[in-house]
Curated annotation (Swiss-Prot):
Binding site for substrate: 126-127, 280, 297, 361
The protein's role, per its UniProt record: Ulvan lyase involved in ulvan degradation. Ulvan is the main polysaccharide component of the Ulvales (green seaweed) cell wall. It is composed of disaccharide building blocks comprising 3-sulfated rhamnose (Rha3S) linked to D-glucuronic acid (GlcA), L-iduronic acid (IduA), or D-xylose (Xyl). Ulvan lyase catalyzes preferentially the endolytic cleavage of the glycosidic bond between Rha3S and the uronic acid GlcA, but not IduA, producing oligosaccharides that have unsaturated 4-deoxy-L-threo-hex-4-enopyranosiduronic acid (deltaUA) at the non-reducing end.
Record: active site: 127
Site (Neutralizes the sugar carboxylate group at subsite +1): 236
Cysteines paired by S-S bonds: none
Record GO biological process: polysaccharide catabolic process
Protein known as: Ulvan lyase, long isoform
Binding positions for Ca(2+) 2 per the UniProt entry: 300, 303, 305
Record keyword Isomerase present: no
A Pfam entry, by short name: BNR_4
Binding site for Ca(2+) 1: 189, 199, 201
Family per record: Belongs to the polysaccharide lyase 24 family.
Domain of life of the organism encoding this protein: Bacteria
Organism encoding this protein: Alteromonas sp. (strain LOR)
Length: 999
């Protein structure tokens, strides 16, 4: 056992702040000699097709796969660890259990072997980690492993029905005796997609194959345990610049998992956002809540960020994260999130000066945590993309928000780290230095890290991953040796949280205070007491921005009182107070109180003082502006006003890259107006303007406005002007900007045209995206997609005998395909094609007759129709005749005739009035179409259309006869073959009322 007891002095606090800590290495145990490690070349897309076939194990992304990811967890007195077995030809998934009480080690070997990068076992992939958890409620073991955004179709279909890998044990397996801790305690897959009798991998976590779409395209499994023992799993859905975090929940009572729920939407552009984006960070369950912290990678390749930008943070007040999501200020956010700006904390890219496209590199050294009392800590790093540039910059950032504070404190006084952890109210940096573990500690809500543990002997480690539980670090490490099989160790390090419980309790009256510049008084009564009976507070020291103000050794611990008015930065408020010669300037200041008790234990509290400026308020119309080289006009109306009543603005001066342009002493403060068109670098735009002899050339320029008020106070504002020269990116085009197909289409192959207009350059790649999701990167011409070896790329079903039907064809709607061409200079162009998938049309059907008019007592009526299917592969099932929504008869083969032959009377019962006739055709796809006509049945004898036959009709009948109008032969009531006056008696007999002749 190794113990290092230290008393260290923080460089930021000089000699005033010390921290006692006794951190001990409790146990170290070797888990195996055979942890899989990739010892070969780091491949890329140019050589991944030719990996080493010998002993060396080439890899993609990184060399680590064992002791990597979510690979170590605890359950009661056991520590569980996952790993892959080395060497190169083994690769089995392994699970080890260490009994911390008796030192017993149990290991299970699973049949599954690491499948390698995109299914090539000769190329290792570091992203295919094994996530691990044990339910504290029922003792089931859960593992999700060996996947990187796979689905049924990508990578040539290599992962069909095997794109998600989940293994789980029976209840109670976690604490079985050593002899019973065996593979048979895990549940086999007996579903229809099982790969055999030794298949312990399940395609879904719900047990329902109908849910398999919910488990596709996932990466980076990580489990959490909530305060009530519920297991949660989170993973990343999708790709690097178009992704989402998803999570699900385990119900220990029913031993079942839910489907995945999204924290944020992917394909954000389709949902109204300006661009698609992915997440680089973590979802964590800390301090009793599910939380998310990440950096964003957008698909904008023309901004100053090479990959990621920003720091984003959110948390959920729902016990399991299913709703009630908020930003760090407690404001509700859209859930699932679409616009990441709703939860943005700050921009690390603002901490270096580069502005050119792809010049800022924010990758790695990002992590975050939250202490038990609610202090939020986020670490990040920003540097120049080009390490060789003369003005190379690199900044490590620690942003933290003490519990109760309203805003983050952003500190660049931070040496940097890759991960940050928490236990109790402290934050920790745990890592390797010279291959040996060390621990640094800071009180939550502070930036005061000191080293409390470091190993000076023992094995030299290559890397590791860790889990902290109940004040102990379970550090799972791989020893640095050689080959494709290297030893794995577990170290258990006690963080000595018990001593922290004895530390003093210290606090400011408020976590944050806002005052105006020139404030006269700020008195702070700092509360400090010991939680341990018999101890007393020896002193309280106040620091402002890490500078010691004073140490007070007696109650009350009051700073800024009448005898010391200046120590809190105030001017003074009594007549006897001389004005403070060094008052606090406008801006944010960190006040820190350090309490030390009679045993030498100490604690720290912080307060943020925001000092509002009295200086003028000045601003450009916008912070940055892009124009094309040779721009004709740039007029800038600079806003300037005093923040103090009674003061006025004396002048506003404009500078370009430090050179004075002009000082304006009267409103409006307008530069680049018609009388001075050249002063902002423009060419001029009026006929009276001669061309600018010295226009601003392509490049970036800093415009600075300096506003001065009548008291001589100044304020500066800046604007970045980017003058864009003519870029010459590749030219990429589709054969057609819009393609229309019918659902179920078998084939769609398209060759994309890509070329560079610049001599000496060539096209390096053409990348195809479907609705924002990566389809494939093609690195050699011709740029053909959807060909016979990749028939599904445009969503087609497949057309050759060897093509299995596409299980995920594109549905009805409009789909956007984006082609991105990249040339040898790194310039990119993109163009979109709209693929419109139409619903298969129903059959065509037509009633041959037009609208029909009949009289009651009609004797004959037949209706005929013709129909055909929309496609040769579709058959016609039936035609059905409806009259007034009443089915008359359905006919299953032509001829389609109603009212003839054996059915001659089926249409003879229509009553007086108008009837809707519909013929509905149905095809073998259950698609339907219809044709319709109207049949109008008039009352026989009702010549004036008043719905009765009466004397008026007989008179009209006689009148029509006299006028020689042709009458319907059905009015030949006496059957002599003509309609004449002798038929009047027959009409009278049809009168609606009796005694028609007397009406």
């Amino acid at each position: 056992m190794k113990c290092l007891k230290t008393l260290l002095v923080s460089t930021t606090l000089l000699t005033a702040f010390s921290l006692n800590a006794e951190v001990t290495l409790e146990q170290q145990v070797k888990i195996t000699e055979e942890g899989l490690h990739f010892d070969g070349r780091n491949l890329d897309f140019s050589n991944v097709g030719t990996p080493d076939t010998g002993e060396k194990y080439d890899y993609f992304f990184g060399p680590n796969i064992s002791a990597h990811g979510d690979a170590v967890k605890t359950y009661r007195h056991y520590v569980f660890m996952t790993w892959y077995k080395g060497g190169k030809n083994e690769r089995n998934v392994m699970l080890s259990r260490y009994n911390t009480l008796n030192g017993e080690l149990s290991t299970i070997e699973f049949p599954h072997k690491h499948t390698g990068f995109r299914g090539d076992p000769l190329v290792g992939e570091s992203h295919n980690t094994i996530g691990l958890s044990v339910s504290p409620i029922n003792g089931t073991i859960h593992m999700v492993f060996d996947m990187h955004a796979y689905d049924n179709n990508n990578h040539g279909g290599k992962f069909k029905d095997d794109f998600f890998r989940y293994s789980f044990s029976v209840a109670g397996a976690a604490e079985l005796p050593h002899s019973e801790f065996t593979l048979d305690k895990f549940v086999k897959d007996t579903s229809e997609v099982s790969q055999g009798d030794d298949d312990y991998k399940h395609l879904t976590m719900t047990g329902d194959l109908d849910d398999k779409g919910n488990f596709a395209r996932l990466t980076y499994p990580k489990f959490f345990t909530t305060v009530d023992g519920t297991l949660l799993l989170y993973m990343r859905l999708g790709g690097n610049n178009n992704g989402a975090y998803v999570f699900n929940r385990y119900d220990a009572e029913t031993e079942s998992w839910s489907t995945f729920t999204k924290f944020n939407e992917n394909n954000q552009k389709l949902k109204g956002n300006q661009y698609n984006w992915g997440l680089y960070g973590n979802m964590k369950y800390v301090n009793g809540k599910l939380r998310v912290g990440f950096q964003q990678r957008s698909n904008d390749n023309s901004d100053k960020y090479k990959y990621q930008n920003g720091v984003y943070y959110a948390y959920s007040d729902h016990p399991d994260g299913f709703g009630d999501w908020k930003n760090h200020k407690g404001e509700p956010m859209t859930w699932p999130l679409i616009n990441s700006d709703e939860i943005k904390v700050f921009e690390p890219g603002d901490y270096i000066s580069h502005t050119e496209a792809n010049s800022v590199y924010i990758v790695g050294s990002f992590d975050w945590t939250v202490t038990e009392k609610g202090d939020i800590h986020i670490i990040s790093k920003v540097r120049s993309t080009d390490r060789g540039r003369a003005d190379y910059e690199e900044v490590y950032i620690h942003s933290y928000k003490p519990a109760g504070a309203e805003e983050f404190i952003i500190s660049t006084d931070f040496p940097g780290a890759s991960e940050i952890y928490t236990s109790g109210d402290n934050v920790y940096i745990v890592g390797l230095e010279g291959g040996r573990p060390y621990v640094e500690k800071a009180q939550g809500g502070t930036n005061n890290f000191i080293r409390v543990y470091e190993a000076s002997d023992g094995p030299v480690f290559d890397h590791g991953t860790l889990y902290i539980k109940d004040g102990k670090v379970y550090y799972y490490l791989m020893e640095r040796t050689s080959g494709t099989a290297m030893p794995l160790y577990l170290q258990i390090i006690d963080l000595d949280l018990e001593s922290d419980a004895n530390a003093p309790i210290v606090s400011f009256p408020s976590p944050s205070v806002t005052v105006n510049q020139g404030y006269e008084k700020l008195s702070l009564n700092i509360s400090a007491e010991s939680p341990v009976e018999g101890r007393s507070i020896q002193s309280v020291s106040l620091y402002i921005d890490d500078e010691l103000v004073r140490t007070d050794d007696s109650l009350p611990f009051l700073f800024g009182h009448g005898s010391k008015p200046h120590e809190t930065g105030a001017l003074g408020w009594l007549d006897r107070h001389e004005p403070n010669p060094s008052p606090l300037s406008a801006g944010r200041h960190v006040f820190k109180a350090v309490a030390v008790d009679s045993e030498g234990d100490s604690s720290t509290a912080t307060m943020i003082l925001n000092v509002n400026s009295n200086a003028p308020i000045v601003s450009f119309p916008q912070e940055s502006l892009e124009v094309d080289e040779g721009f004709e006009r740039l007029s800038l109306n600079i806003s300037a006003e005093s923040a103090v009543e009674g003061r006025t603005i004396e002048s506003v001066s404009l500078y370009i890259d430090g050179g004075l342009v002009r000082t304006d002493t009267s409103l409006p403060y307008l530069f680049g107006h018609a009388s001075k068109p050249h002063e902002t670098g423009a060419m001029g735009w009026l006929d009276t303007h001669s061309p600018n002899p010295s226009p601003l050339a392509a490049g970036s320029y800093e415009f600075t406005a300096v506003a001065t008020d009548n008291e001589g106070e100044e304020t500066t504002a800046s604007m970045l002007l980017v003058v864009k020269g003519e870029p010459e990116p590749p030219i990429v085009t589709w054969p057609n900007s819009t393609v229309t197909v019918y659902e179920g289409y078998e084939k769609l192959a398209i060759t994309i045209d890509a070329e560079t207009p610049v001599e000496g350059r060539d096209i390096q790649s053409v990348t195809l995206f479907r609705n924002g999701e990566l389809v494939r990167v093609d690195t050699r011409p011709v740029w053909n997609f959807g060909h016979s070896f990749a028939p599904y790329e445009f969503g087609a079903m497949g057309w050759l005998d060897r093509h299995e039907p596409n299980p995920s064809p594109l549905g009805v709607g409009t789909h956007t395909f984006t082609a991105v061409a990249r040339d040898s200079a790194g310039l990119e162009s993109e163009t979109d094609m709209a693929l419109i998938v139409l619903s298969l049309p129903g059959p065509s059907v037509m009633i041959n007759e037009g609208d029909i008019s009949l009289l009651t007592e009609y004797q004959n009526l037949a209706i005929t129709a013709e129909a055909s299917a929309a496609d040769d592969d579709i058959s016609l099932v039936s035609l059905a005749l409806y009259i007034d929504e009443q089915l008359i008869r359905e006919i299953y083969e032509p001829p389609f005739i109603w009212g003839s032959d054996a059915y001659s009377t089926e249409l003879l019962s229509l009553t007086e009035g108008t009837h809707l006739v519909r013929v509905v055709a149905t095809d073998s796809n259950n698609k339907q179409s219809e044709s319709s006509i109207f049949i109008n049945i008039d009352l026989l004898g009702d010549l004036n259309k008043d719905s009765i036959v009466d004397k008026a009709d007989t008179r009209l009948f006689t009148s029509k006869l006299r006028a020689g109008e042709i009458m319907d032969i059905r009015y030949d009531f006496n059957g002599d073959g003509v309609v004449n006056n002798r038929d009047t008696r027959g009409l009278v007999r049809r009168c609606t009322y009796s005694r028609c002749s007397s009406n």
